[in-house]
Amino acid sequence: MTNTVKLTEFINDNSNLRVLQGQECVAGKEITVSDVYRPGLELSGYFDFYPADRVQLLGRTEISYAARLDHDLRRKVFEKICQKETPCLLVSRNLPVPVELKEAAEAAGTPILISNDATTYLMSMITQYLAVKLAERSSVHGVLVEVFGMGVLLTGESGVGKSETALALVQHGHRLIADDRVDVYQRDHETVVGEAPRILKHLMEIRGIGIIDVLKLFGIGAIKDETEISLVINLTNWDSKANYDRLGFQENTRIICGIAVTQVTIPVKVGRNMENIVEVAVMNFRAKAMGFDAAKTFDENLTSLIAENSEEEKRG
């Protein structure tokens, strides 16, 4: 199913936009493409490959060029620009809208929006907004928290202690984004973002207590609507026979929305302070990203020590 954004929602979410003409047509319009188009060649009469299903943005360049056209040509061009599938026309900088454009838009049932903002700003702002709104979303089982400003997805089998660990992290001053189910989407080629489903927003389930409202119990500083997922921490029940990473050389990843995210596995055992371990895991991940790798330093020091001992044995 293709995601859509109703034009009414688009206008309400962006206070810098207002309807100049065609208010009665707004409710029936939907946006299905995140790209915004500036009709340039179309003003000269070239309409091959014209993407009529996009938001059409007209700035100072387009309006001034159209003003140089004769009346009949200007009318024909605007009639072709305004198609039934066109969600809306948007004019920047509060520029005067040509009469021919108003007539063509009215005939096609295309609303005209206007904004005081610059064209390039509107292009960037709208593209980013629509990219998020129209992104394909999927769900993963886990708890998403923000620790030291970094999005951490806690995963593991049911009952392993994900929610309890997240609650302890919130009490340490960190933030909850989503509990139990995390909706994820790809923001760009390198970024995956997680958020809570609307029905679960700010809520957490703690076994033995039930559903709690983190916002009301801990305040606005304890929650966040969404965050980029930078690290996955997989919590597993302690297995004495398992071969856990003791030095930190293993680098594993988990694919989320087609993006590889670093994953570490932490065994859960009675007596282990999981929130502190998660905090250390995040700090260690950030340190590695900055070029400080304790495991690598240890390996280099060990190799150097072995080499020195070998030289001493040869001399002895």
UniProtKB/Swiss-Prot annotation:
Described purpose of this protein according to its UniProt entry: Catalyzes the ATP- as well as the pyrophosphate-dependent phosphorylation of a specific serine residue in HPr, a phosphocarrier protein of the phosphoenolpyruvate-dependent sugar phosphotransferase system (PTS). HprK/P also catalyzes the pyrophosphate-producing, inorganic phosphate-dependent dephosphorylation (phosphorolysis) of seryl-phosphorylated HPr (P-Ser-HPr).
Residues in coiled coil: none
Family designation: Belongs to the HPrK/P family.
Binding sites annotated in the UniProt record for ATP: 156-163
Important for the catalytic mechanism of dephosphorylation: annotated span: 267-272
Record-listed Mg(2+) binding positions: 163, 205
Highest taxon of the lineage: Bacteria
UniProt-recorded Gene Ontology molecular function terms: ATP binding; magnesium ion binding; phosphorelay sensor kinase activity; protein serine/threonine kinase activity; protein serine/threonine/tyrosine kinase activity
Positions of the catalytic residues: 141, 162, 180, 246
Gene that encodes the chain: hprK
Cofactor dependence: Mg(2+)
Annotated region (Important for the catalytic mechanism of both phosphorylation and dephosphorylation), positions in chain: 204-213
Name under which the protein is recorded: HPr kinase/phosphorylase
Keywords: ATP-binding, Carbohydrate metabolism, Kinase, Magnesium, Metal-binding, Multifunctional enzyme, Nucleotide-binding, Serine/threonine-protein kinase, Transferase
Pfam families to which the protein is assigned, alphabetical: Hpr_kinase_C, Hpr_kinase_N
Domain commentary: The Walker A ATP-binding motif also binds Pi and PPi.
UniProt EC number: 2.7.11.-, 2.7.4.-
NCBIfam families registered for this protein in UniProt: hpr-ser
Catalyzed reactions: [HPr protein]-L-serine + ATP = [HPr protein]-O-phospho-L-serine + ADP + H(+); [HPr protein]-O-phospho-L-serine + phosphate + H(+) = [HPr protein]-L-serine + diphosphate
Enzyme class: transferase
InterPro entries: HPr(Ser)_kin/Pase, Hpr_kin/Pase_C, Hpr_kin/Pase_Hpr_N, P-loop_NTPase, Ser_kin/Pase_Hpr-like_N_sf
Listed PANTHER family: HPR KINASE_PHOSPHORYLASE, PROTEIN YJDM-RELATED
Top-level taxonomy: Bacteria, Bacillati, Bacillota, Bacilli, Lactobacillales
Subunit record text: Homohexamer.
